[in-house]
């Protein structure tokens, strides 16, 4: 099973393979073999699976047994989502206890919503899920897939940097998606944010620095750092240690992206300090094969006095293949120039 650099593909389907009792070889690329998997590996091995690594390959076999499972909540919510998908298929009832701090809780809530929509029964008591076995998921004949707040955030942040503003449609106001919090952060920055039932419009206001807790919204930090770089005063981004475990070390790659465009930013152990300026200079950004860094750099072009060139534009295909086409449709002139991996900048 080819995973590419997709952590969610690996972490979701590894326990599902164990629930089905099938032998699977997962093929990983990029930084995925280095991203943390040990807590999930240990739990799966303790409940009947056999796991063997061979470079970028992970060989999995065996069948998961019902029982008491426990996973940390402060490494990756994808561990928990993957097990919640797998446990209903086991032969008997299981429990899953989330230990330690819980980060990215919104993604787990989305998993619960999807499972219940599919007819799966589970109970949650504080930090423990009770999941009956012998269940089969069955989606309704028709169901509506929500708009993606994580990808919409780039355009909403462009709106916060533009007096004209940007309107995004198809976003569920009552969504469980954690990255819906982008609106709250933009309001705190001072942006003009207006919502209807499924439409959001964001325009520039008198932007000022804020403090951002990265723990529940790690994927928003690159693009929110761009807004911080164009806001008055300092912005402190805290509790961001997990960003070092993404497709790139996102603390360092976010800082490198901002510096390449003329921003003032400092990296400390688990966060960033960004000092805003009225404009950025523009320049060339190497996103380090990280889709969110590339899209954040394109967002920054809204506040630059010269063009932004983004190398390796294809890295955005991982999460948003139409990003550059949608950006071109939105702007009268290209907001950022892009190059393929084998092209010069």
Predicted regions and their residues:
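Short, structured segments at the rim of ligand-binding sites
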Residues: 1-345
């Amino acid at each position: 099973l080819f995973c590419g650099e997709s952590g969610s593909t690996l972490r979701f389907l590894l326990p599902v393979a164990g629930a089905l009792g099938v032998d699977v070889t997962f093929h990983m690329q990029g930084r995925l073999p280095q991203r943390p998997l040990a807590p999930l590996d240990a739990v799966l091995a303790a409940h009947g699976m056999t796991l063997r690594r061979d470079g970028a390959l992970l060989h999995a076999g065996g069948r998961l047994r019902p029982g008491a499972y426990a996973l940390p909540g402060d490494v990756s919510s994808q561990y928990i989502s993957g097990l919640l998908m797998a446990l209903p298929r086991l032969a008997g009832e299981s429990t899953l206890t989330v230990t330690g701090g819980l980060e990215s809780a919104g993604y787990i809530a989305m998993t619960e919503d999807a499972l219940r929509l599919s007819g799966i029964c589970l109970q949650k008591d504080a930090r423990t899920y009770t999941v009956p076995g012998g269940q089969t998921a069955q989606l309704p004949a028709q169901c509506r897939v929500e708009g993606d707040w994580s990808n919409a955030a780039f355009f909403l942040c462009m709106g916060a940097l533009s007096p004209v503003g940007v309107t995004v449609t198809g976003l569920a106001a009552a969504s469980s998606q954690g990255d819906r919090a982008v609106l709250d952060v933009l309001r705190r920055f001072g942006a003009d944010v207006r919502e209807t039932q499924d439409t959001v419009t964001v325009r520039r206001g008198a932007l000022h620095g804020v403090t951002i807790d990265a723990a529940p919204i790690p994927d928003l930090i690159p693009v929110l750092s761009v807004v911080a770089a164009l806001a008055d005063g300092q912005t402190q981004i805290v509790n961001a240690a997990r960003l070092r475990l993404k497709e790139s070390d996102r603390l360092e790659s976010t800082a490198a992206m901002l510096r390449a465009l003329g921003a003032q930013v400092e990296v400390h152990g688990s966060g960033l300090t960004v000092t805003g300026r009225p404009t950025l200079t523009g320049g060339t950004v190497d996103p380090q094969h990280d889709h969110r860094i590339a899209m954040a750099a394109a967002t920054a072009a809204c506040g630059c006095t010269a063009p932004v060139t983004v190398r390796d534009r294809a890295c955005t295909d991982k999460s948003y293949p139409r990003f550059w086409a949608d950006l071109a449709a939105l702007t009268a002139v290209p907001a950022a120039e892009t190059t393929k991996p084998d092209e010069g900048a």
